[in-house]
C-alpha cells in the first residue's frame, strides 16, 4: 500500500517530511516528490504550490509516476463553523468548487461541466480519520463540506455569498476540489483534511500568517494518526 500526501505550502508538509524515514527525493517539472516511510506506511509527500492549477499538476504527476493507492490532501483552511477554533480540523464529507458557475447549461452552482457536483472521499479513509480523532487531545475535528477556489477569502460580503450557495460549508481553501477532481478522473481514492488557520473574515490575512504553522502541524498530526489507523486490506 502506498499513500500520496499533498500539501500546498512548506508549513503544511514540513512536519510530515521530518517524520519520514528512508526518504528519497525526485523533482519533476519543478515539483519535489519525497518517497519514504511514515507511520508504518509507504508514502510519497509533495508540496504542490498554491491554487487549483498547481494542485492539479502535482496530483497528476503523483498518480502517474508513483501510482498511489490513495491520496490525502493536507493543510490549512478558512473556517465557517462557529464551534470550531483556529487549529481545529475539518475532514471532508464532500468537496466542491465554490468559484465555478456553468449553471446556464443546467449544472449546479460549483459543478464543473461533465463532472459531479461534489467529489466524495473514500469511506475507508474517512473512517480511519474518524478513528484518529480520539487521539487528537484538545484539538476538535468534524466531518464537513470543504469548498475550493482560487481566492483567499477574507471579505465578509464574499463569505456571505458563498454561504448562500453552500450553506453547509465548513471550510474553504484553494486546492482540495482540484485534487479530488484529478483523483476522480484517475479512479484513485482520496480524502481532504484541513486545519483552520483563520475564520475567513477581515482578520484572515493576519490570522493566516500567525497560525499557518499551528494549522500545518495539527493537520500533519491528523494525517499521521490516520495512517496508523489505515487498514491495508481496506484499500480498493
Swiss-Prot record:
Q: Which residues does the record give as substrate binding sites?
A: 78, 153, 174-175
Q: Which SUPFAM superfamilies match?
A: Purine and uridine phosphorylases
Q: Which reaction does it catalyse?
A: S-adenosyl-L-homocysteine + H2O = S-(5-deoxy-D-ribos-5-yl)-L-homocysteine + adenine; S-methyl-5'-thioadenosine + H2O = 5-(methylsulfanyl)-D-ribose + adenine; 5'-deoxyadenosine + H2O = 5-deoxy-D-ribose + adenine
- What is the active site of this protein? 12 (proton acceptor), 198 (proton donor)
The UniProt family comment states: Belongs to the PNP/UDP phosphorylase family. MtnN subfamily.
Q: Tell me the InterPro entries matching this sequence.
A: MTA_SAH_Nsdase, Nucleoside_phosphorylase_d, Nucleoside_phosphorylase_sf
One GO cellular component term of this record is: cytosol
A Gene Ontology biological process noted in the UniProt record is:
nucleoside catabolic process
Enzyme category, top tier? hydrolase
State if Transmembrane helix is listed as a keyword: no
Return the protein name.
5'-methylthioadenosine/S-adenosylhomocysteine nucleosidase
> Which pathway does it serve?
Amino-acid biosynthesis; L-methionine biosynthesis via salvage pathway; S-methyl-5-thio-alpha-D-ribose 1-phosphate from S-methyl-5'-thioadenosine (hydrolase route): step 1/2
Stated EC number for the protein is 3.2.2.9
Function according to Swiss-Prot or TrEMBL: Catalyzes the irreversible cleavage of the glycosidic bond in both 5'-methylthioadenosine (MTA) and S-adenosylhomocysteine (SAH/AdoHcy) to adenine and the corresponding thioribose, 5'-methylthioribose and S-ribosylhomocysteine, respectively. Also cleaves 5'-deoxyadenosine, a toxic by-product of radical S-adenosylmethionine (SAM) enzymes, into 5-deoxyribose and adenine.
Which keywords annotate this record? Amino-acid biosynthesis, Hydrolase, Methionine biosynthesis
Q: Which cysteines are joined by disulfide bonds?
A: none
Q: Which organism is it from?
A: Shewanella baltica (strain OS185)
Q: Name one GO molecular function term.
A: adenosylhomocysteine nucleosidase activity
Top-level taxonomic group: Bacteria
Amino acid at each position: 500500500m502506498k499513500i500520496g500526501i499533498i500539501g500546498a505550502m512548506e508549513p503544511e508538509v514540513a512536519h510530515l517530511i521530518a517524520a519520514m524515514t528512508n526518504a528519497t527525493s525526485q523533482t519533476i517539472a519543478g515539483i519535489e516528490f519525497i518517497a519514504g516511510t511514515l507511520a508504518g506506511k509507504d508514502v510519497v509527500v509533495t508540496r504542490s504550490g498554491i491554487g487549483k492549477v498547481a494542485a492539479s499538476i502535482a496530483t497528476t504527476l503523483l498518480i502517474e509516476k508513483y501510482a498511489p493507492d490513495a491520496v490525502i490532501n493536507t493543510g490549512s483552511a478558512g473556517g465557517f463553523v462557529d464551534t470550531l477554533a483556529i487549529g481545529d480540523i475539518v475532514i471532508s464529507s464532500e468537496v466542491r468548487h465554490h468559484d465555478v458557475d456553468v449553471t446556464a447549461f443546467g449544472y449546479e452552482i460549483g459543478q464543473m461541466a461533465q463532472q459531479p457536483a461534489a467529489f466524495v472521499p473514500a469511506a475507508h479513509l474517512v473512517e480511519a480519520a474518524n478513528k484518529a480523532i480520539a487521539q487528537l487531545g484538545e484539538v476538535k475535528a468534524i466531518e464537513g463540506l470543504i469548498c475550493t477556489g482560487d481566492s483567499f477569502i477574507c471579505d465578509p460580503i464574499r463569505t456571505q455569498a458563498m454561504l448562500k450557495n453552500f450553506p453547509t460549508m465548513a471550510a474553504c481553501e484553494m486546492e482540495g476540489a482540484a485534487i479530488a477532481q484529478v483523483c476522480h478522473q484517475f479512479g484513485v481514492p482520496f480524502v481532504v483534511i484541513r486545519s483552520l488557520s483563520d475564520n475567513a473574515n477581515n482578520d484572515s490575512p493576519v490570522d493566516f500568517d500567525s497560525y499557518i504553522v499551528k494549522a500545518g502541524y495539527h493537520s500533519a498530526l491528523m494525517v499521521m494518526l490516520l495512517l496508523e489507523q489505515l487498514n491495508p486490506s481496506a484499500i480498493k
